[in-house]
């Protein structure tokens, strides 16, 4: 019944004051404000040397694992043009930050202790969650 009543009503557009034309002579109403977007010039990422073919990686006999000759392309081909490669790749650890010998942990005893405490906390927290949701807890 209500569907019949709703269908019989004639719908007309509302006269909103925002949709009415401007009464001033010579002034055109604007449907939207003018918006100008200006992009700033991007900063160039500076790297001491690009990594990859031509940037420190040397393949045995100049051939990669698939048997193709490395041309120094990929993201590293734009190092001279943009100051870095396309995606601004920067490795977390650079050769300047490496330990002189790989057999000494740079964090020392304090770092190892903190690592062990963190690992133990994660394992104990997981065990507590398993225990608290099991039938043994009730």
UniProtKB/Swiss-Prot annotation:
Keywords per UniProt: Chloroplast, Membrane, Photosynthesis, Photosystem II, Plastid, Thylakoid, Transit peptide
UniProt KW GTP-binding keyword: no
GO cellular component: chloroplast thylakoid membrane; photosystem II oxygen evolving complex
Cellular localisation: Plastid, Chloroplast thylakoid membrane
A biological process term (GO) from this entry: photosynthesis
Transit peptide endpoints, chain numbering: 1-39
Family under the similarity heading: Belongs to the psbR family.
Role description: Associated with the oxygen-evolving complex of photosystem II.
Protein name as annotated: Photosystem II 10 kDa polypeptide, chloroplastic
Gene assigned in the entry: PSBR
């Amino acid at each position: 019944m209500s569907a019949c009543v709703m269908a019989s009503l004639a719908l007309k557009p509302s006269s909103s004051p925002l949709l009415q034309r401007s009464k001033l002579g010579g002034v055109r109403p604007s449907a939207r404000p003018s918006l100008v977007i200006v992009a700033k010039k991007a900063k160039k990422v500076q790297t001491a040397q690009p990594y990859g073919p031509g940037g420190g990686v040397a393949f045995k006999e100049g051939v990669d694992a698939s048997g193709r000759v490395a041309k120094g392309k990929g993201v590293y081909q734009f190092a001279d043009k943009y100051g870095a490669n396309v995606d601004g790749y920067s490795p977390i650890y650079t050769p300047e930050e490496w330990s002189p010998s790989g057999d000494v942990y740079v964090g020392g005893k304090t770092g190892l202790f903190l690592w062990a405490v963190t690992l133990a906390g994660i394992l104990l927290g997981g065990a507590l969650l398993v225990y608290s949701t099991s039938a043994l807890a009730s």
